[in-house]
Amino acid sequence: DTFDIPADLIPRQFQQVIRHCLEKNPQKRYQTAHDLALALKAIERGQWQVSSGTRKLWPSIAVLPFIDMSPEKDLEYFCDGIAEELIHALSRLRGLYVTSRTSAFQFKQKALDVRLIGQQLNAATILEGSVRKSGTRLRITAELINTSDGYQIWSERYDREIQDIFLVQENIAGAIVENLKIKLAAGFDQPLVKRYTEDLEAYHLYLKGRYFWAKRYEAGLSKAMDFYLQAIERDPEYAPAYAGIADCYTILGSYGFLHTKTAFDKARAAAEKALELDETLPEAHVAAALISFWYDWNWELAEQSFQHALQLNPNDSPAHIWYATFLSMMGRFPEVEVEIRSAQKLDPLSPLVNSLAGCALYMARAYDEALLEFQKALDVDTDFLVALSFIGSVYIEKSMFNEARAAAERAVKLSSRSSFSLASYGSILAVLGHTEEAQSVIAELQNRSKEQYVPAFCFAMIHIGMKDYDRAFAFLEESLQDRNIQICFLKESPGLDSLRSDPRFRALLHRVPFP
């Protein structure tokens, strides 16, 4: 049987999804079942507004990755770079709320209705565009769309030589300011798109570095660093490239891929050089903050650097979420909530932002809320390693032991058995009473340590789970000597609660200058 349902009884948002499924042009339909599921989830979560009233989101914008229309399809890094440069430029405007890169780029190569994208990103307008290259000529199109009704506000086509890319970006940013009626601050007389180099090849190398840095895995970081170094060879005064190198080394050091001292000494040199060249570069201040936080244990300077970065760019979601992480380590949990919400407003679909929010809430012992944040991250990316690596600790606190083991096993597999994922897995096995399996993980890490760096904290985690506290304290002592970043967790981490009554733990705490 069939039923005729009056159109006015079908929610407007669901009608839009159906129309999208029935588009005559296949390219305009949902390209995968996952894309359709995203649309339906948005309705389920109430992210579509049922009322017909206009949302008060103005002025706000999400810049989507530009589409590579070149026959060779070899400009993905360049298309991403244009969008990212525009995000950076627009983020400097005080009167405009700008969705961060990670969330905007979740819609890369997805044929979704801009109204749905606007709802998911909480953005009143969308900027999208395309790039076609022929020889030394570029054709760049850009279109600004109102997400409440899908209508075009502005569009333009630029046919230029490739060396004019900075001028094109400036023109696009200026058109957005004009069309969204953004009032520039008094005395704001500088270009919206800051030009850090006149060397076009250095600029391309930097964009390639950003492309690989965004992947955030060890091989990608190595490639990113190589491109940044090549950019610096061409232009030794290219400040963002130095900031990029600092970012890479802080990640490599924090993930345990490099010895802490090696990583943070190199990160410090790069961050200081970036700030020497341009003290207004927000990402360089964030890198400096992380070095002061994770390695120097200079909490006052770390906080000053975080706050300076946010003064320079209030739309910097990584700065907000790393500042939240810092505040959680300091036990300042009411302030943590403010920074988490600021980061999530700017970057609602970022798996990293939501995972770090989960970590901060775990430190606050808000386990139900932490679990929700990790699950939000995994809803977007089911294989997101940071979420999988930490959600197990929350499951343990909630006595969800099967889930804890399953998450840890996935993290080990997806990370190609990285040291930290193995340590987390080993500690969970130990807590579950699987001592023999936990011992085999220790043996694997010991064999690895003969050829490459394995942070001492990895061994400490497993011995804590086994209640072998003498060995755990020996490895914690080594971790303190090496300044493993996990030492910053000593004061607040629930995973260390079993040690807190031990005089050795209190003595260890006194050697770290916690406030």
Write out the residue ranges for each language-model feature.
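C-terminal lobe helix-coil module of Hanks-type protein kinase domains
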Residues: 1-48
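Acidic, proline/glycine-rich low-complexity intrinsically disordered segments
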Residues: 2, 50-421, 429, 437-449, ...
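Residue-level recognition of oxygen-bearing side chains
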Residues: 13, 35, 335, 471, ...
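Residues at helix-coil transition
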Residues: 19, 23-26, 45, 181, ...
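K/E-rich alpha-helical interaction surfaces of small helical-bundle regulatory domains
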Residues: 153, 211, 495-515
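Amphipathic alpha-helical protein-interaction segments enriched in hydrophobic
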Residues: 419-424, 453-464, 488
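TPR/TPR-like alpha-solenoid helical repeat scaffolds
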Residues: 426-433, 487-503
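TPR/TPR-like (Sel1-like) alpha-helical repeat modules
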Residues: 477-484, 513
